[in-house]
Amino acid sequence: VFHQHMGDRRIDADFDTQVFAGFAHRLHENGIEFKDFSPGNVLVVVRENGYEFYLVDLNRMAFREEMSLEKRLKNFERLPPDERLIRIISEEYASLVRKPFDEIYEGIADATRAFRMKFELRRKMKFWKRRKK
């Protein structure tokens, strides 16, 4: 699982993350929006000749003719709120889409922050809703 590899010293986690950014870019270039890039839904297999990525929850995909940059960056919203992880993905993704690093980093960081805020708000609302019963 992707998040398990982030702390695995047997593999180069930075390189693993860069390769993941390339994998996501290839999906986006082909108009594939995987709606749940949460760490548990991305499986990583380390092979002698590189990495293989597999997606879980394939029913959470959308196929589009084209994906705007805004849509692509929002697609990373479920990544863990780990600045180092977001920075590495942003560096690689920026080079692949030929955009400034700051633009990509801010877009992904904003998307992950907004998602976390919505997630926490929903969690709190559920808590208070249960207390009313």
Predicted regions and their residues:
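Protein kinase catalytic-loop region centered on the HRD/HxD motif
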Residues: 24-32
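C-lobe/activation-segment region of protein kinase-like
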Residues: 51-124, 128
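Conserved protein kinase catalytic/activation segment
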Residues: 41-55
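Activation segment
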Residues: 36, 46, 62-64
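Conserved structural core of kinase catalytic domains
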Residues: 1-15
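Catalytic-loop of the protein kinase fold
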Residues: 32-39
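Charged, glycine-rich intrinsically disordered N-terminal tails and low-complexity linkers that flank
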Residues: 129-133
